[in-house]
Each structure stands twice: as structure tokens, then as C-alpha cells.
């Protein structure tokens, strides 16, 4: 009797489980999720933060600072946009525009960006409802560290702070920097020597091709100690081709951003106008960077490499429709390089996507009021005022005389009038982040459905088991005669403080 009851319970449980499995299969068929081992799978999704809502990218300011537009793929949901970011080289920001009345996570547009320029976070944002920003964890940490530093370690030359400085092999490499700064080698050939012959110059001897990581520490008797990291990359001959000998590339997008490129014929850096996307590495924000990377370089533009049609493409390469590989910067340069011409076939998607991103309007034109005060790259001592959105007041800082940002006023009253109404709610990343859609709403429904099915099956089995035990306890004790078919049935059950520093020194 007990065996029959348990068998009936098992059949019922199996029946429920089969119904659940069929329902799950139907749900999965509707909206499949990417496997964890694929580039757009769960391992990729875990690299991103939860979405930062109600802010949109200030495209003009971001690209002017060095951010790069990477594309605008078609996507139905926010997390589809993130998956596209996972499979796009250098993508660290997926910006989505929500679809009005489209349901949870339904979107109308997806934009992919690289918000790093030489390891510095350079994207700017403005408050606007209807948008969500998904950043990689690494990028978000970089942003939080930038905010936490306040003035960003202003007594250490900002031109060197946290960046990857490209240089030619020189004996020695001479850099301008502030006095009282100690250099400590963290990574690279230990034969390198740091010498100081002038108060505001440092000489690096023994550099070889490769990468060096230095920690700069500024110590003053009247100020707290400050540190910053500097990466120096001594370019190889192959890298020099890309950074110095390649012809400058405006790109397909129709923006207008001043940049510098190196002209190896005249051995000087020249200005040009960058369109905003699909550039190459001979593209610098500042003339000083350009000259340091390409000092005294001579030569001609490298020959165009033939497509490689065997093996898989590297991350820096463009994959042609027929499977061949070409250098990534050859995409959309008005010259077909793929045998099938596919590198020039879909360039309009970049143009239209960037135009759409540029045409997103936001009400506030006071985004600079939420920026940290910037002393710039020069070393003058000019008293200025900056606006603090946390206190909603203006405070003094010392401006170095060049570069910097617009949160820079000659008079306190001018500062207050220009930034009236700006508060901490206008600072990107401070508002409560949206829920983490590590899976889409369909995947969430699947998970809930599975849990319910498991609970139902376990409840049926448990109920039948205890009911059977109770009946056996109340029945007379007797031992039925053994039969050859009798057997024993056993069951086993396996079950982030942002600060504004009020003391700044010039660079």
C-alpha cells in the first residue's frame, strides 16, 4: 500500500514537473537569453553596474573631452543594448532611451560609447528623464574616484594624472612637473632612473620599449599627502606607425571637434576637425601630447595591409562579411579593403546614430555647474570662484591659467547667478540607481516560475509521505508474509562620499 501511495505521489509530482518544463520551454522560446559563456552572456552582464536613470550624455562636451561614439545598434530591451556593448571593443557605456508606455525595460534607442581617454573618465551628463546609463564596474569606479578626489590632486600636474602617456624612445625623457613630487616605479624595467636637475623638471633615464607605471606622491609640510599614478608607454616601431605615421582620419560622423595629428613630412603636429567617430590613433586632444608621442619621427604612411582570410579576427580588427579580417581603423574610410566591400557597406549606421545622439536636447545648459573645479594645466596663480552643488554656494579656488572647465568665475555674484537652481540632484551618479536588470523581465518570470514549480512538487511529495507515515503508525502491527517481489523503497532529498576640496593649488 505504501509503495502504491508513494508511486502515485511520484506520478503526480512528475506530472506537475512536466507541465512546468513545458511552460518553461514555451517561455524561453519567446525571448531566449544569451548563454553565460558567450560574449553577451551572464558573465558579461555582471561587469556592468545597475542603470543610472534620469541622465543623458552631453555628447558635445563628452566627445570634446575625448570620448568616442561606437555605434547605435538595434535593441528591444535595455539589457540587449548592454549585450551589444559587451561585444563591442572599448565599449564601457550603454545609454538607452526608454520607450514611452512600452513596458518595463522596453527601449526606443541604444547608444554605445567609450568614456575613457588615455585612462581618464571624460564623459559628461545632464539630467533628463527617460534615459538610463549602464556603465562597466571599472568605469564607474574610475568616475567615483574622480569625484572623491575633489580637485583631483590638483598639486600634482593634471596633464600627467592617471593617463597613459605615449612617448618615443628618448635619452632622457624630460617632463615638466611640480616640485616636491616623488616618483616611485610600480611596474616596468627596474633599470630606469629618475633624476631631477631643475626644480620643476624630471628626467627619466634608461627607458626601453614597453610600459611603465609610476606613482607620483606630492608632499608639502602644510598640505596632506597626495598620490596619483602615471603610465608611460614607450612606443614600438609598429605602434609608431599607428600613432604617428598614419594619415589623419576625420571619420564618417558629422560633428566638429578640434584635434591634433602628427605630420611626419614636416615633423610637426597640425590641427584638424574630427567628426566624432571612426577615427584612428593619430588623433590627439592637445598638441603637447602629439609632440611627445611623435617627437622627431620620420617616415611615410604605412602601406595598407591585405585582408587576412584564415583564422579568427583579433579584437582590434574588423571582420568582413566573408570572414576575412582587416585593421579596425580601415572601416568606413571611403576605401574598400574587404574583398566583398563590407567595410564600407553599413557606414550610414554610424552617421545616423551619432546625429540622433547629438540631437537629444536637455533643458539645463548649466551642466558645468556640477563639474569639479579644474585648475587646468598651466601654473599661474589666478583667484577664481567655482560653484558647489552640494552646498549651493560658491567658493574660491586657484586657476592655473589654461584649459580647465566652465565652472570658473571671476566674481562670486557671477558664479551664483549663473548656477542658481543647480543642486546635488544634478550630479550624475548620486540619484538612486535603477534596479539591476541582470536578466530581462522574461528571464525573471522564468526564474519565478521555476521556483513555484519546485515548491509545488516538494509539497506534493512531502504531503503524501507524511500521510503515509501517519496511517502506518495507527494500523495494527503485523508482518505480512514476504513475497519474492517485495522491495524496499527509499527516497533521498537534496536541497559610494563625494567631496569638494576647498584648498587647491595651481599646477
UniProtKB/Swiss-Prot annotation:
Disulfide bonds: 244-294, 253-277, 269-290, 320-338, 332-347, 369-419, 378-402, 394-415
All copies of domain BPTI/Kunitz inhibitor, residue ranges: 244-294, 369-419
Major location category of this protein: secreted
This protein's UniProt keywords: Cell membrane, Cytoplasm, Disulfide bond, Glycoprotein, Membrane, Protease inhibitor, Repeat, Secreted, Serine protease inhibitor, Signal
Signal sequence residues: 1-29
A cellular component term, taken from the record's GO annotations: plasma membrane
A matching Pfam family: Kunitz_BPTI
Glycosylation sites: 229, 501
SMART domains linked to this entry: KU, LDLa, MANEC
Coiled-coil region list: none
Entry's free-text remark on domains: This inhibitor contains two inhibitory domains.
Subunit structure as annotated in this protein's UniProt entry: Interacts with HGFAC. Interacts with TMPRSS13; the interaction promotes the phosphorylation and cell membrane localization of TMPRSS13.
Full protein name: Kunitz-type protease inhibitor 1
Organism: Mus musculus (Mouse)
Lineage: Eukaryota, Metazoa, Chordata, Craniata, Vertebrata
Gene name of the record: Spint1
Amino acid at each position: 500500500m505504501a509503495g502504491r501511495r508513494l508511486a502515485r505521489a511520484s506520478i503526480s509530482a512528475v506530472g506537475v514537473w512536466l507541465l512546468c518544463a513545458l511552460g518553461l520551454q514555451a517561455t524561453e522560446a519567446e525571448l531566449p537569453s544569451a548563454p553565460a559563456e558567450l560574449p553577451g552572456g551572464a558573465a558579461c552582464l555582471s561587469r556592468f553596474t545597475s542603470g543610472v536613470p534620469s541622465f543623458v550624455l552631453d555628447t558635445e562636451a563628452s566627445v570634446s573631452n575625448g570620448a568616442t561614439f561606437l555605434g547605435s545598434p538595434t535593441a528591444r530591451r535595455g539589457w540587449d543594448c548592454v549585450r551589444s556593448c559587451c561585444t563591442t571593443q572599448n565599449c564601457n557605456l550603454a545609454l538607452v532611451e526608454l520607450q514611452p508606455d512600452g513596458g518595463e525595460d522596453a527601449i526606443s534607442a541604444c547608444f554605445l560609447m567609450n568614456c575613457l581617454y588615455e585612462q581618464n573618465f571624460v564623459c559628461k551628463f545632464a539630467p533628463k528623464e527617460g534615459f538610463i546609463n549602464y556603465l562597466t564596474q571599472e568605469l564607474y569606479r574610475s568616475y567615483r574616484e574622480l569625484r572623491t578626489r575633489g580637485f583631483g590632486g590638483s598639486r600634482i600636474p593634471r596633464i600627467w594624472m592617471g593617463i597613459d602617456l605615449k612617448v618615443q624612445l628618448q635619452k632622457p625623457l624630460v617632463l615638466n612637473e611640480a616640485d616636491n613630487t616623488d616618483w616611485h616605479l610600480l611596474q616596468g624595467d627596474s633599470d630606469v632612473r629618475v633624476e631631477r636637475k631643475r626644480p620643476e623638471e624630471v628626467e627619466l633615464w634608461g627607458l626601453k620599449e614597453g610600459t611603465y607605471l609610476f606613482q607620483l606622491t606630492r608632499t608639502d609640510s602644510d598640505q596632506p599627502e597626495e598620490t596619483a599614478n602615471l603610465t608611460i608607454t614607450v612606443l614600438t616601431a609598429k605602434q609608431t606607425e599607428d600613432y604617428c605615421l598614419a594619415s589623419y582620419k576625420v571619420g564618417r560622423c558629422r560633428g566638429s571637434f578640434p584635434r591634433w595629428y602628427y605630420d611626419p613630412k614636416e615633423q610637426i603636429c597640425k590641427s584638424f576637425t574630427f567628426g566624432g567617430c571612426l577615427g584612428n590613433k593619430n588623433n590627439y586632444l592637445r598638441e603637447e601630447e602629439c609632440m611627445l608621442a611623435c617627437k622627431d619621427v620620420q617616415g611615410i604612411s604605412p602601406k595598407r595591409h591585405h585582408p587576412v582570410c584564415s583564422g579568427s579576427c583579433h579584437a582590434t580588427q574588423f571582420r568582413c562579411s566573408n570572414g576575412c579580417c582587416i585593421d579596425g581603423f580601415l572601416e568606413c574610410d571611403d576605401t574598400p579593403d574587404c574583398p566583398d566591400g563590407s567595410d564600407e557597406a553599413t557606414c550610414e549606421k554610424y552617421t545616423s546614430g551619432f546625429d540622433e545622439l547629438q540631437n537629444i536636447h536637455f533643458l539645463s545648459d548649466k551642466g558645468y555647474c556640477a563639474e569639479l573645479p579644474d585648475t587646468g594645466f598651466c601654473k599661474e596663480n589666478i583667484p577664481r570662484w567655482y560653484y558647489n552643488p552640494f552646498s549651493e554656494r560658491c567658493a574660491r579656488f586657484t586657476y592655473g591659467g589654461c584649459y580647465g572647465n566652465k565652472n570658473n568665475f571671476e566674481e562670486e555674484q557671477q558664479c551664483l547667478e549663473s548656477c542658481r537652481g543647480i543642486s546635488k540632484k544634478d550630479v550624475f551618479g548620486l540619484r538612486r540607481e535603477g534596479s539591476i536588470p541582470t536578466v530581462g523581465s522574461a528571464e525573471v518570470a522564468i526564474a519565478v516560475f521555476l521556483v513555484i514549480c519546485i515548491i509545488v512538487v516538494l509539497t506534493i511529495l512531502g504531503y503524501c509521505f507524511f500521510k503515509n507515515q501517519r496511517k502506518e503508525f495507527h494500523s495494527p502491527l503485523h508482518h505480512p508474509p514476504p513475497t519474492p517481489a517485495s522491495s524496499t523503497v527509499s527516497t533521498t532529498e537534496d536541497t559610494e562620499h563625494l567631496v569638494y576640496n576647498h584648498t587647491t593649488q595651481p599646477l
